[in-house]
């Protein structure tokens, strides 16, 4: 009988190799996801800072609150980072709420 196919041992070896590859790649994906969320939050902070500066230029140096930026159309919605933390303006500085 000359049947073509894989033996159980060959299948187990392939599954073992796939398992090892998954164990190597999953932590890297998680690490990159955290980095992406951090960079996204930094980008949002920089955007709000730029909009604050534009508001100050348009309103004779008046320091805006986040509500001012939203009501005037500088920021369209609540500033929330990809990780769920909110952007706040305190004392004229843009910060991430902890």
Swiss-Prot record:
GO terms for cellular component: cell surface; pilus; plasma membrane. Belongs to the ComGC family. Processing of ComGC in competent cells requires ComC, while stabilization, possibly by formation of a disulfide bond, requires BdbC and BdbD. It is found in: Cell membrane; Cell surface; Fimbrium. Keywords: Cell membrane, Competence, Disulfide bond, Fimbrium, Membrane, Methylation, Transmembrane, Transmembrane helix, Transport. GO terms for biological process: establishment of competence for transformation. InterPro entries: ComGC, N_methyl_site, Pilin-like. It comes from the Bacteria. Residues 4-29 are annotated as: May be involved in polymerization of ComGC. Major component of the type IV-like pilus (T4P) that plays a role in transformation. Transformation pili are dynamically extended and retracted, perhaps thereby promoting DNA uptake and transformation. Required for transformation and DNA binding. The chain crosses the membrane at residues 6-26. The modification N-methylphenylalanine is found at residue 6. It is a single-pass membrane protein. Its main location: membrane. Coiled coil: none annotated. Gene3D superfamilies: Glycoprotein, Type 4 Pilin. The transformation pili are flexible filaments, consisting mainly of the major pilin ComGC and smaller amounts of the minor pilins, including at least ComGD, ComGF and ComGG. Homodimer. Forms higher-order multimers. Interacts with ComGG; the interaction is probably direct. Residues 1-5 form a propeptide. The lineage of its organism: Bacteria, Bacillati, Bacillota, Bacilli, Bacillales. Disulfide bonds join 41-81. This is Competence protein ComGC.
């Amino acid at each position: 009988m000359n049947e073509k196919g894989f033996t159980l041992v060959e299948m187990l070896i392939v599954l073992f190799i796939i398992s090892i590859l998954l164990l190597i790649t999953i932590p890297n994906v998680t690490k990159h996801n955290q980095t992406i969320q951090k960079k996204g939050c930094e980008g949002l902070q920089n955007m709000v800072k730029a909009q604050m500066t534009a508001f100050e230029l348009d309103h004779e140096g008046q320091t805006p609150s986040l509500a001012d930026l939203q009501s005037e159309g500088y920021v369209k919605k609540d500033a929330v980072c990809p990780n769920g933390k909110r952007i706040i303006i305190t004392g004229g500085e843009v910060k991430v709420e902890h």
